């Protein structure tokens, strides 16, 4: 029992810090905090996809699918925002389901390039078709989350702090779901498909179905992240989901490491803090990409297993028992 | 009544090379059936064609009269045919227990929603029990927390079989299960295989250890250059002139 | 109509010549090093900036600036080999990530050195060959076409007729086997990186007066190069050239009759179809994935 008590106290402390955190930050830092929170969901969903061993370059576009879908549902169909976000997530999952048919005929490097091509085609369609996607300028004036109040607390979702609480709660729930999936027999099967797809097949695993499952579930969560972002910023455009953004996601994931659930989250937090806060405060505006690139190279050279490997050295991993 | 497992004029070509050439034989239900032949004879290729790893260039494989050749590997597995691999093919990064758990995949099919909500407790418990049973059967229960890639060679072979065993197969195809085992381990493993057979599992085994094959098999098929060379009981095969010839002179290369 | 087609053909020929220089370099690096060099577009960009600095800024002769572009970017390739790909030899994904880091560094350096605005470079020549009223080929484009043919011819000669070229092709097939034949892996890697990067640099240098030079110009170049090497077959140099020509014609044609974005979509769709139907590419046989 004392372990459980300890865990409860630990998590309560973490929650308290997370709740108090925005009040210690400046306004612009609060905004960054909101984006970072949403990005945590993006990298966590990306990791689910990589569990089966495939690396996609189309994930950010899938995030964009959720953003565009949710924005359009509110704008064109008048669907209320929280519902449209969920529908946006479903749209991403559905699109991923459709893409899985051509894409999972490929593996490895070919999948990487194929996912890039598929994503880029979707992005160019947004750019090309003014109706309904708004062309290169994208969609402006996306409905925000409606204000609401619980008792004494009023949430005005133009305020980064309010939106941080909202997005934080959603993201925390999603991370918990992703974690449950990973720790389940389904997650074990994902790992198995990654390490030895032949052996997995000979144990009766439908490898293609599991790859698709990981892709679709990951895309659903990615779409939700996109929708969360769209209704906060209020405007989206095709360039926001281009390959450069994808490179950031890839970098967070790799610098953090992909062997553990927390690796990509660590990567996202560490690099966001470095990029947005440390380098900005130090006044290296133009040099930021340079330092970022250098950090990327140094970490892959000297910390190839990611930041998570530092933690793993400290805490011996415990193995699953039911 | 249909024969249990029937390999019928099976042919497998790779470009110009015909690795299996019109091979036919049948495996009786509940038998331990050996498939032998010199290196490069096409034994592994035959296994690959039976288990759905390859789509045969010609011929058929039938299980209880149903054609299973051309199905994909997991579909063949779901019909009860489970294979092991010649080289220690394991989920090297996972623990021994997790490896065995993968063997229970078909009996306890995972489900995302159940897993999230927590409605799969029963299944998880069942899978765990089955996995532990498989490890115990092959004497691996003490190693369940080890990383599979760190195991000694003999243990790795045993774990490969434990995964197959956990899947409740009707037929297992074992490709050189005794390599990397010392004589005691081999003897123990032979005992386990007889036990496995007695529990109703049909075994098709490829093995170069003649001592083991002769001591274990009810029936043996010998192939060379992809073709059937001889078939019969151990005594017949041991004294069959073509078999002796193939092993002494006809082999393309000697191991 | 005929005029339009002829003009489109000339435009495509020009596009094909610099695309194939870039793509052949990318294939060479992938073949020998086994890494996908994401920074290849930025090597192209670096070549263009050498011309900006030496020819537009320093008043050096154009050809000298182009040669300097080849040499300088070739050296960047050697630097990448030494600092990134050699230490990461056993980690192809790591090599890819490192090349992304290098890409960011190159881009940021260009931004800091030259600013984000487009550079306007004085044209090398104003002359135009007019085949008819509407079919015209500017001399400066002809130079690019001629240079590409000469360089690719030289590369072909080098690969097929010299010992080093033979070594390079051998290690692209099978590095271990080539090493057993007494060919140093390190040496072939350095040659491949110098040539591969140099080709991207020279392509950027040659086209610099004809395009808008800016720090982000590499992006569309690398996308095009990927399409081309996939369609041509990842391991095949000849395939890369043929696919460059084919892609340039299709892209230019669609751009002329519809618009550039549709042309990009068509190009990407072509690549996707090839990936689905024949992942080894139209000319490739080796499966190195
Ligand atoms: N995927 C393949 N492509 C081309 N040739 C193959 C392939 N697989 C096997 N072969 C060839 O088919 C022949 C039979 O090989 P196979 O592995 O079935 O022999 P084997 O009887 O299992 O030999 P061993 O006892 O050494 O395991 C060999 O000549 C081999 O080179
Ligand atoms: Mg074999």
Predicted regions, residues:
Chain B
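Glycine-rich phosphate-binding loops of nucleotide-dependent enzymes
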Residues: 2-255
């Amino acid at each position: 029992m004392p372990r459980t008590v300890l865990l409860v106290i630990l998590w309560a402390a973490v929650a308290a810090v997370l709740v108090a955190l925005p009040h210690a930050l400046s306004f612009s830092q609060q905004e960054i905090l909101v984006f970072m929170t949403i990005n945590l969901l993006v990298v966590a969903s990306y990791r689910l996809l990589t569990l089966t061993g495939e690396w996609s370059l189309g994930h950010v576009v899938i995030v964009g699918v959720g953003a565009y879908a949710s924005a359009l549902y509110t704008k064109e169909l008048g669907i209320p925002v929280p519902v449209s976000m969920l529908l946006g997530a479903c749209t991403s999952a559905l699109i991923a389901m459709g893409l899985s048919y051509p894409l999972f005929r490929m593996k490895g490097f070919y999948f990487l390039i194929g996912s890039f091509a598929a994503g880029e085609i979707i992005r160019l369609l947004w750019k090309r078709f003014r109706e309904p996607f708004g062309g290169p300028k994208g969609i402006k004036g996306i409905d925000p989350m409606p204000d609401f109040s619980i008792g004494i607390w009023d949430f005005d979702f133009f305020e980064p702090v309010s939106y941080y609480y909202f997005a934080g709660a959603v993201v925390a729930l999603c991370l918990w779901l992703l974690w449950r999936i990973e720790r389940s027999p389904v997650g074990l099967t994902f790992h198995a498909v990654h390490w030895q797809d032949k052996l997995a097949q000979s144990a009766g695993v439908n490898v293609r179905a599991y790859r698709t499952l990981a892709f679709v579930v990951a895309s659903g969560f990615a779409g939700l992240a996109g929708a969360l972002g769209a209704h906060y910023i209020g405007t989206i455009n095709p360039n926001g989901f281009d390959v450069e953004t994808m490179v950031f996601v890839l970098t967070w994931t790799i610098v953090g490491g992909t062997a553990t659930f927390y690796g990509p989250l660590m990567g996202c937090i560490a690099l966001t803090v470095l990029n947005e806060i440390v380098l900005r405060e130090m006044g290296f505006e133009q040099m930021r990409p340079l330092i970022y690139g250098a950090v990327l190279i140094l970490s892959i050279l000297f910390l190839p297993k990611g930041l998570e490997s530092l933690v793993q050295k400290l805490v011996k991993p415990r193995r699953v028992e039911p | 009544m249909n024969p249990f497992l029937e390999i019928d004029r099976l042919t497998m070509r790779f470009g110009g090379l015909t690795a299996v050439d019109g091979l036919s034989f049948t495996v009786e239900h509940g038998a331990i059936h050996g498939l032998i032949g010199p290196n490069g004879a096409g034994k592994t290729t035959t296994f690959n064609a039976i288990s759905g790893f390859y789509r045969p260039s010609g011929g058929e494989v039938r299980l209880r009269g149903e054609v299973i050749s051309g199905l994909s590997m997991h579909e063949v597995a779901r019909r009860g045919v489970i294979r092991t691999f010649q080289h220690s093919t394991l989920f090297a990064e996972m623990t021994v227990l997790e490896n065995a758990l993968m063997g229970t995949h078909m009996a306890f099919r995972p489900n995302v929603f159940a897993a999230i909500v927590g409605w799969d407790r029963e299944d998880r418990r069942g899978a765990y029990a089955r996995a532990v049973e498989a490890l115990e059967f092959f004497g691996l229960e003490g190693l369940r927390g080890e990383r599979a890639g760190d195991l000694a060679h003999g243990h790795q072979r045993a774990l490969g079989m434990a995964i197959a065993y956990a899947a409740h197969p009707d037929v297992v195809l074992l490709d050189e299960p005794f390599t990397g085992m010392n004589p005691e381990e081999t003897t123990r493993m032979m005992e386990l295989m007889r036990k496995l057979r007695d529990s109703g599992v049909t075994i098709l085994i490829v093995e170069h250890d003649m001592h083991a094959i002769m001591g274990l098999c009810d029936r043996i098929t010998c192939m060379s250059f992809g073709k059937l060379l001889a078939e019969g009981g151990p005594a017949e095969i041991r004294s069959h002139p073509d078999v002796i010839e193939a092993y002494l002179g006809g082999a393309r290369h000697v191991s | 109509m005929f005029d339009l087609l002829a003009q489109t053909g000339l435009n495509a020929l020009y596009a094909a010549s610099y695309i194939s220089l870039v793509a052949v370099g990318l294939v060479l690096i992938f073949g020998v090093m086994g890494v996908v060099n994401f920074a290849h577009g930025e090597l192209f960009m670096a070549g263009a900036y050498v011309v900006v600095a030496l020819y537009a800024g320093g008043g050096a002769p154009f050809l000298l600036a182009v040669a300097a572009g080849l040499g300088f970017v070739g050296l960047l390739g050697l630097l990448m080999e030494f600092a990134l790909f050699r230490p990461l030899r056993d980690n192809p994904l790591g090599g890819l990530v490192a090349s992304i880091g290098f890409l960011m560094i190159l881009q940021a350096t260009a931004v800091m050195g030259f600013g984000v605005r487009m550079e306007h470079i004085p044209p090398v020549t104003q002359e135009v060959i007019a085949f008819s009223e509407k079919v015209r080929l500017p001399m400066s484009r002809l130079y690019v076409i001629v240079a590409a043919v000469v360089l690719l011819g030289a590369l072909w000669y080098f690969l097929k007729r010299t010992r080093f070229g033979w070594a390079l092709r051998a290690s692209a097939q099978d590095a271990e086997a080539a090493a057993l034949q007494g060919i140093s892996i390190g040496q072939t890697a350095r040659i491949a990186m110098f040539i591969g990067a140099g080709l991207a640099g020279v392509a950027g240098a040659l086209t610099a007066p004809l395009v808008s030079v800016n720090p982000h110009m590499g992006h569309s170049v690398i996308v095009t190069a990927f399409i081309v090497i996939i369609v041509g077959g990842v391991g095949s140099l000849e395939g890369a050239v043929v696919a460059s020509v084919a892609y340039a014609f299709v892209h230019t044609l669609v751009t002329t009759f519809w618009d550039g974005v549709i042309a990009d979509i068509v190009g990407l769709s072509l690549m996707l179809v090839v990936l689905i139907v024949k992942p080894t590419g139209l000319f490739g046989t080796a499966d190195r994935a």
